[in-house]
Amino acid sequence: MSELSTYKGYSPKHGDKVPVLQNLNDLTPKDFYDKFIATRTPVIIKSSLPESDWKGYLWQQQDYLLSKIGDIVCKVEPIDPVSGTFGQGMSRNEMSIKEFFQKLKNGERLYLTTQYDESNEVLDGDDEVSLLVKSLCPHPTDGLLTDFSITPALMGNLVPQQCNLWIGKSENGTSSGLHHDFHDNIYAVISGYKRFVIISPDHANQLKLSGKISKIHPNGLISYEGEDCPQRSDGLTELDAAIAKTQFLEKKIGSLKELAVPQESIELLEAEYENEMDRVLQMQIGGPEEDWNDLEEGDAASLLDGSVGGDPESDILLNEGNDIEATSLQDTKPELPDHFTKVSVNGLHKFMGFDDAKNVDVDKDELSALAGTVPLVVDLEPGDMLYLPASWFHEVTSSSASSGGSDVHIAFNYWFHPPDNLEDFDHPYLDRNIWQAKRHLVGEAIDQLYATNKKNEKRPAEDDSPSQKKTCQ
């Protein structure tokens, strides 16, 4: 393991297989946390989540799905006719979900994902709750809110980051390319089939990543050099964390004023608040501290308008839809995001001995990059779910049941902020004050989402009042 790595989670040995949960009955969220989340161990879930949390199986019926979201207009991406890939600069076209399904039926090669949706852009006057409402469930996922819980009981006290929908069609299989993500993930297959090849984060340094690693945290989260604000082990940038701290202090000051506590105590917190605001402004805008002395209490939320750069997962589909074709390390395009490897789909499949790459020549450097790793293979069918901890590398091959008719592959993602206090189910994040503020804001956003969509949803628990959901079914 590299000196850059402090990873303490599960690392497979030869002969290991991904564990399978056949039944969630009698399994508590704490059981799941202790066995899998805390140990950073992927697990296949064969048992359905309780009806109160998950009715995604209804989306297997296309008529039902279209009745829910058919009229919603989204951006859909065509395959690049030159490279045969998705996500490499092709213009995305707006169309209704009904029109998208019809084009798939007619044989057009298109892909829909909400993971890098830009239609919910930041508008002047948006506060953080408004931004969270837009980002937690991008269109058309918000049209399906009556069918799933943003905070499923199984995930205990983890804070949700986003929910995503993926729809495509391919008889022979399309590939995501080998990459990692920055959040814990529950991947649910609605229709079609998915084959995952997964590799633990402790092999990151040998996988020819596009970016240069600065650190692999104990929970496996990978940070990169050259970022304006390097990621912390909980997935936040320093700017994110500083803003959250100002929000926590702002809320606490307001509460103390209502309680009429001594002014001296309030003044100490106000001084801390002002210092934190200065840090935020210097990271966000730059310039001398004295330029910002006129800011009033309550300005913290406004700092978020456009303050945070692109989501590191926003280019997740860079190679989605890639037909198998030889690509050497030297041929890899420089615009690959940091978290993608330069190992081609062919190289990985050749190393794994998959039939589609048996007769394909690949660069020896690709095979040597994979030597010493212990990839695990996960085959998922409709109804299956996979828990994958943050920064586990994975290549996903998606395929439909058949090429004719209306068969499509549909998947759904839950993303959660990665825990960095792994031994504490009740408080899975080390920076409690910051995550108390984040939980409160996420809870408000969830309330707004479900109020709009006519469903009641339990908020994620505050850090000082952890989740008391005891069973998953």
Curated annotation (Swiss-Prot):
One Pfam family linked to the record: Cupin_8
Keyword NAD: no
Family annotation (InterPro entries): Cupin_8, JmjC_dom
Residue stretches making up the JmjC domain: 140-433
Origin: domain of life: Eukaryota
Region (Disordered): 452-473
Gene3D superfamilies documented for this protein: Cupin
A single GO molecular function term of this UniProt record: peptidyl-lysine 3-dioxygenase activity
Gene Ontology BP term (one): meiotic cell cycle
Keyword terms of this UniProt record: Meiosis, Nucleus
GO CC entries: chromatin; nucleus
SUPFAM superfamilies per UniProt: Clavaminate synthase-like
Subcellular location: Nucleus
Role this protein plays: Has a role in meiosis.
Protein name: JmjC domain-containing protein 4
Gene encoding the protein: jmj4
